[in-house]
Amino acid sequence: MIQSVFSDDAWSIWEPLIETVRPKGKTPPRDLRRTMSAIFWRHQNGAKWRSIPAELGPWWTAAQLFIRWAKLGVWQALFEQAKGQDSALGLVFLDGTNIRAHHKAAGAAKKGDSGERRNDREALGRSRGGFGSKVCVAADGHGKALSFTLTPGQAHELPSAMALLDALPHAPRYVVCDRGYASNQFREALWDRGSRPVIPTKRNEPQVACPKWAYRHRHLVENLWARLKEWRAVATRYEKTATSFMAVICIAATADHLKT
């Protein structure tokens, strides 16, 4: 017997947030709690929609709601509601990870484009780690996600950095990154924004100050990725479209914010 993903206490937290962001012109499922449990079960287990246990309701109800809300930006809005305005922006960490795509993730409609353009549109590409996507995150001083970018797997992390920071309510005091972000131009851009860069230099670069006490906390963003990848549909991309995959990431990040 599959129990609801949401205990009474958990649902008392989730329900008002969902009611805030769900489309008001649409009638919610008769049992929204059960449908949400089905969506969560599918993404936590990386299963096919048809594999959703019957106790959680018709699989097509869950699939239709997930896809419709993904296209409307509801899951992104839910993530924004969950993170609130009390994020710890003294330290902000930037980090990216490659997510390998399941072979069925490459089946999105071409819409008149070539296969290459289709893959670029859906944030899919081939890197040394295989065929997949690059997901970058900005995390706060508590190790909680603040913003995401999604690009093809072969993309470098640095071009996504400013988009991650632009999504924050104000400039953080310190921006902590690994050597993949080492660039004098990027450091200068951070200073111009009022943020101090905490980025180790590469071996072929002149030494630049990098406060060790701040860099020592970079494990917080690594731990965030470890938690998010406990969702099998985050650790492996099963979604054909970038919109749906970003929705999965937002659901996992929302759950991480609301975890007690």
Where are the language model's segments positioned?
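Short alpha-helical elements
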Residues: 1-260
